[in-house]
Amino acid sequence: MHFNIFVEGEFNNVKGVFIDQSYPLRIQCTNCGSPHEKSVVLSEDSVGEGDFGEKVNLSITCRCCRRIMTLKILKLKEGREVKKHLLPTNFEDEFKEVWLSDMQKSRFLVSRIETNGAEVTSIESCILNLVSNQDVLFTNVNFEDRTVAKCNNLNMISSIIDFSLTVELAK
């Protein structure tokens, strides 16, 4: 199964958002339906092995039925799902490369997960990064109380109201 993770909300002066590809999830076994008792941390830097020797980011055994559950973070497709943006830095000839998806229905696609034997029920938190329409990058943005507001040096505010992280089964 494939799951998409979205950042949703009411966006103002936001060109795009992206998250660090390491985050805590809640999962449940697709074999017996039992939820895993703790959150699991999925990270693109972790490498494990699945049932058939394939590379995965996380492999866990269900405590109820002993089924092996595997999860893998997939790269978003360049051009179709994400586009490269070069953001100016403090140095004249330097740029920072970021990959942003287009907003669709008041949300941005920020990650895709492939699972075997597991269903992703929720994402608990993430490290959020925001790019304003003026190409200003805000890193490690705090989204307590479901609201994000950042001001750049031009006194322009970028905000997300009713911020939420949602997980959907991909079609």
UniProtKB/Swiss-Prot annotation:
InterPro entries: CXXC_Zn-binding_euk (IPR008584). SUPFAM superfamilies: MAL13P1.257-like. It holds the Pfam family CXXC_Zn-b_euk. This is Uncharacterized protein ECU01_0250. It comes from Encephalitozoon cuniculi (strain GB-M1).
